[in-house]
Curated annotation (Swiss-Prot):
Function: Adapter protein implicated in the regulation of a large spectrum of both general and specialized signaling pathways. Binds to a large number of partners, usually by recognition of a phosphoserine or phosphothreonine motif. Binding generally results in the modulation of the activity of the binding partner.
Keyword set includes Acetylation: yes
Location of N-acetylmethionine modifications: 1
Short name of any one Pfam family annotated for the protein: 14-3-3
SUPFAM superfamilies linked to this entry: 14-3-3 protein
Name this protein carries in UniProt: 14-3-3 protein beta/alpha-B
Gene Ontology CC annotation, any one: cytoplasm
Predominant localisation class: cytoplasm
Length: 242
């Protein structure tokens, strides 16, 4: 199947909400070795975000059930085995994405915008791995995630407007990484607040095409800040991500 057919297949799969098919089509496009267009890049990102998102959600549900079945060994064992099955799926998906990023996407990125997009993605998928990892492998995934986010962040500050939706989305996810993975609310709040304030200060640079995307992410940054700084924040509260 040629590239345009694969892209069309991915769009059909998206409309049918068959994200595994969508991801497979966009993986094949990426393996063609040609730099992706913005549209193709977004299709790839949406596909895998949904594929991995379903497993992240399932993993959280089953982990919670596993904790609640303490005292009932048989039920707990079933929950644990099911969690491990979901974990394996999640790890395989993340390995797929990280492989594509390393082999094709980051190397082929000719524009700063693309490089930041893919390095952010690398940070995201190592973060997803770190959520289910333990011991040495957790330390490694956390380190890899932080390095990818930091590399992306440095490029975005140098080469992109503070109102650019990719720069804002990176700040959003990097701040979530600080809060959830590094347990560092101060750094999370500082990063989110700086990104929000810098964007507000340059609202006149907002590109008409990306106005909706940028303002939505700014709203998510503000929501997270409100959540993180409120004293009576419950453990169950969930952060917004891009």
């Amino acid at each position: 199947m040629d590239k345009s057919d694969l892209v069309q297949k991915a769009k059909l799969a998206e409309q049918a909400e068959r994200y595994d098919d969508m991801a497979a089509a966009m993986k094949a496009v990426t393996e063609g070795g040609v730099e992706l267009s913005n549209e193709e890049r977004n299709l790839l990102s949406v596909a895998y975000k949904n594929v991995v998102g379903a497993r992240r959600s399932s993993w959280r549900v089953i982990s919670s059930i596993e904790q609640k079945t303490e005292g009932n060994e048989k039920k707990q064992q079933m929950a644990r085995e099911y969690r491990e099955k979901i974990e394996t799926e999640l790890q395989d998906i993340c390995s797929d994405v990280l492989g594509l990023l390393e082999k094709y996407l980051i190397a082929n990125a000719s524009q700063a915008e693309s490089k930041v997009f893919y390095l952010k993605m690398k940070g995201d998928y190592y973060r997803y791995l770190s959520e289910v990892a333990s011991g040495d492998s957790k330390a490694t995934t956390v380190e890899n995630s932080q390095k990818a986010y930091q590399d992306a962040f440095d490029i975005s500050k140098k080469d992109m407007q503070p109102t650019h939706p990719i720069r804002l989305g990176l700040a959003l996810n990097f701040s979530v990484f600080y809060y959830e993975i590094l347990n560092s609310p101060e750094n999370a709040c500082q990063l989110a607040k700086t990104a929000f304030d810098e964007a507000i200060a340059e609202l006149d640079t907002l590109n008409e095409d990306s106005y909706k995307d940028s303002t939505l992410i700014m709203q998510l940054l503000r929501d997270n800040l409100t959540l993180w700084t409120s004293e009576n924040q419950g453990e169950e509260a969930g952060e917004n991500e891009n």
